[in-house]
């Protein structure tokens, strides 16, 4: 059982010093460039060293492992406590890649964390399942062609995830970074804690207990989920 702490998020360029007071760092980098399989081990070693040095939780850039596109969460002690494989693929850039088949929600002192890889954020049923599993924070790293980017891609992705599931959501992308919250607890009741930008660092404070003030959402039927789990996860 964890006593929930305030999460002080810093979105910034890889391996640069985190914003003062941050306790969780989300690397932006160039999310269009996934760390290749042959470089992943050394990259993660550097990430673990960074987290340990600055005593922060860290969500690195996406990386490849045995054909899967992955994200992971590293503790301030420099240990990987969980990883998530992409369940759905962005086929123009991932031909031949493998698809994951399971979701993992990681328990932290801030609350439940779910890592949403690439286009999984545009599958609301998947994020809903993660929320039912206890996720209070959704972190998404994705890529998209410049010609595909519009405000609709933000609203239908991480913003929608926050509104539909009463969770906090942070996204990094080669076209934008932003942080979202349910309308009722966002400062201007627009669903944003940090509006889309490419400037870094982006710094935001969040507390999972604040989600209790949100209007209650309808729960997903566990019986319905059990019957259709295969379809929900693709």
Can you annotate each of these PLM segments?
Residues 1-9, 105-115, 137:
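Beta-strand-turn-beta hairpins that frame and shape the catalytic cleft
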Residues 5-40, 142:
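Short, conserved active-site loops that position catalytic residues or coordinate cofactors/metal ions
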Residues 16-23, 37, 49, 53, ...:
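Eukaryotic scaffold repeat domains enriched in small/polar residues
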Residues 24-28, 59, 115, 137-139:
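Structural motif
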Residues 39-59, 124-202:
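CN hydrolase (nitrilase-like) catalytic-core segments centered on the catalytic cysteine
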Residues 60-64:
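Short beta-strand-to-loop element that shapes/binds the nucleotide-sugar donor at the catalytic cleft/hinge
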Residues 66-133, 149-157, 193, 211-234:
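Active-site catalytic loop in hydrolytic enzyme cores
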Residues 71, 103-105, 179, 201-206:
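Conserved hydrophobic/aromatic beta-strand scaffold that supports enzyme active sites
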């Amino acid at each position: 059982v964890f006593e929930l702490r305030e999460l002080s998020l810093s979105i910034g360029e890889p391996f640069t010093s985190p914003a003062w007071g941050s306790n969780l760092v989300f690397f932006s980098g160039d999310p269009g460039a996934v760390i290749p399989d042959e470089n992943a081990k050394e990259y993660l070693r550097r990430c673990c060293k960074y987290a340990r040095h600055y005593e922060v939780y860290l969500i690195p850039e996406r990386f490849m492992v045995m054909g899967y596109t992955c994200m992971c969460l590293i503790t301030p002690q420099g240990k990987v406590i969980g990883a998530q494989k992409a369940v759905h693929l962005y086929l123009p850039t991932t031909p031949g890649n493998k698809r994951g088949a399971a979701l993992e929600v990681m328990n932290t002192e801030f609350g439940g964390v779910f890592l949403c890889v690439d286009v999984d954020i545009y599958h609301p049923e998947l994020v809903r399942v993660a929320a039912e599993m206890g996720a209070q924070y959704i972190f998404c790293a994705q890529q998209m062609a410049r010609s595909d980017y519009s405000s609709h891609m933000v609203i239908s992705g991480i913003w929608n995830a926050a509104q539909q599931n009463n969770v906090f959501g942070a996204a990094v992308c080669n076209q934008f970074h932003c942080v979202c919250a349910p309308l009722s607890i966002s400062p201007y009741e627009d669903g944003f804690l940090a509006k889309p930008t490419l400037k870094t660092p982006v710094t935001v404070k969040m507390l999972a207990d604040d989600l209790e003030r949100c209007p209650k959402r309808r729960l997903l039927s566990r019986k319905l989920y059990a019957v259709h789990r295969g379809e929900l996860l693709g």
